[in-house]
Design a protein with these regions (language model features):
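Transmembrane beta-barrel wall of Gram-negative outer-membrane proteins
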Residues: 1-34
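C-terminal outer-membrane beta-barrel translocator/porin domains of Gram-negative envelope proteins
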Residues: 22, 26-187
């Protein structure tokens, strides 16, 4: 559901969506920490955006700015589960996280015919958990490093966002405690 806002100007939009995903894993071997079981993701997303591009396909002036928030219910608050002793399949039966994304693009024509254009852009993201015991699960994560294309089919299936970074091998800047799914190694 979305609508164009009239304040502060006509370039603003607000969109909302609700989503449910079921990850049914059977003999899945891709570093998730479990290979059999079901994980459920129920999310609410809202996006506030401002788009003032002169053209959608090949913009030569204007800007495109958005802030998006994706939230799941804090299932760890409702479930009676000891996360310290639970298996990964039990921990991630109901996936929980909050994910924030900010994107900005600005197009500036460098000549009068708008044939030469400077594009400045920024892309920020943050994912967090509601509980330090539950941590962030293996789904909907950010992977940094490499060409930005290496995730392939697994990245699509698991909702992973791959962020390319030249000078590094694929997935080489992923935190070393990834196997703990966001939990601290300090005990």
């Amino acid at each position: 559901l979305g609508r164009r806002l009239e304040w502060p100007d006509n370039y603003f939009t607000l969109t909302n969506s609700v989503s449910y995903l079921n990850y049914s894993l059977q003999d899945w071997n891709s570093g998730l920490g479990f290979s059999n079981g079901n994980a459920n993701s129920f999310t609410f997303n809202t996006t506030l955006a401002r788009r003032s591009l002169d053209q959608i396909m090949y913009p030569s002036s204007g800007s495109d700015i958005s802030l998006s928030v994706t939230l799941t219910p804090p299932f760890s608050r409702f479930r009676n589960l000891d996360y310290a002793t639970a298996t990964p399949a039990e921990r991630f039966k109901w996936i929980e996280y909050h994910k924030w994304m900010f994107d900005a693009k600005y197009y500036l024509p460098l000549d009068s015919k708008k044939k030469l254009v400077l594009e400045a852009k920024a892309h920020f993201g943050f994912i967090g958990s509601y509980s330090t015991e539950a941590g962030v699960g293996p789904f909907e994560r950010f992977y940094l490093g490499g060409d930005g294309l290496a995730g392939g089919f697994n990245a699509f299936l698991l909702g992973q966002e791959i962020i390319g970074l030249r000078g590094y091998e694929n997935n080489q800047i992923t935190p070393p405690d990834y196997a703990n799914f966001g939990r601290s190694n300090n005990g």
